[in-house]
């Protein structure tokens, strides 16, 4: 909770208490990886890499030096900007799946790489995003019944600000014009 609360001093102190009490390096590292994803998320995507690297390094190095590696990761995660947008996104998506069941995937997204797929319309009118400006094209990705739903809503902290701005910009630009593939793109 001290990492979530952005208190590196408390995070390192409680790490020391857990180590002193004999808690396993594996358990501590696992909790750090969870915190990096659950509480930091895309506000600082590097936090998960730091936690995973610390877990691997601490396991390989062993105690007593593993405590230094874990302290470095705990301090980093505690000081990182925070976001729980991924937690909220998956919770909302899981609830939607529970409520709506197994909705059909839009036919243009369905696998077209097998004999008979064309007869079923699979892949027909699929637009390859990399053929379009900004590598983005407006098309239905969610089941039609969920059209317009937003599960992931980036927050206003750290890197999520850039994610939000990027998504708004490419959607705005795509909405302004009729989208055609870039020159040289396959159709």
Question: Which residues does each predicted region cover?
Answer:
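Active-site flanking loop/helix segments enriched in acidic
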Residues: 1
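Terminal-proximal interaction/regulatory segments of ATP-powered molecular machines
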Residues: 5-136, 143-187
């Amino acid at each position: 909770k001290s990492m979530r609360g952005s208190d590196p001093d408390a995070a390192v102190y409680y790490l020391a208490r857990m180590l002193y009490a004999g808690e396993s390096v594996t358990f501590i590292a696992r909790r750090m990886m969870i915190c990096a994803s659950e509480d930091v998320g895309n506000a600082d995507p590097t936090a998960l890499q730091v936690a995973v690297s610390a877990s691997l390094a601490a396991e390989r190095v062993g105690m007593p030096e593993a405590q230094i590696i874990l302290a470095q990761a705990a301090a980093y995660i505690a000081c990182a900007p925070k976001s729980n947008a991924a937690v909220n996104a998956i919770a909302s998506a899981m609830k939607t799946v529970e409520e709506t069941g197994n909705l059909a995937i839009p036919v243009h997204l369905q696998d077209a790489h097998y004999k008979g797929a064309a007869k079923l319309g699979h892949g027909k009118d699929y637009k390859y995003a990399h053929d379009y400006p900004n590598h983005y094209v407006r098309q239905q990705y969610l089941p039609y019944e969920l059209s317009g739903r937003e599960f992931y809503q980036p927050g206003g902290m750290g890197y999520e600000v850039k994610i939000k701005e990027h998504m708004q910009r490419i959607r705005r630009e795509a909405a302004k014009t009729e989208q055609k593939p870039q020159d040289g793109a396959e159709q």
